[in-house]
């Protein structure tokens, strides 16, 4: 994927992450670390721009990413508190989960581009991707509503 199509590299990473998160799908990175790409822009600086050109900083988004990673990563916080595991190992687990969600999201986007090279040039492309999660959740909820609640 060419990042310039989408804007700053970290912005497309955020989108890819949320695609993986909402599909609840991960894809491991390649084992050969020399083939991995780096953005070179630390997470703590993502979205830290001054308002210009109608853009606003989105620091809260980083907080939501962190909260989602804490919720979806298998971490024993009690063991961390007791010192049985290191903070470094927890950070590594969170980073690995974030990268795997994003990796799935990048694959998802690549498939869409292979089907239609102009897919993401449509104004509503990402809106359609993310609203598709709402439709899936509604269908699951509707199916659950058909079954009466147990009186036991």
What is each model feature region?
Residues 5-31:
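Short, basic amphipathic alpha-helical segments that act as recognition/interaction helices
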Residues 1-3, 44:
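Short amphipathic alpha-helical segments and their helix-coil junctions
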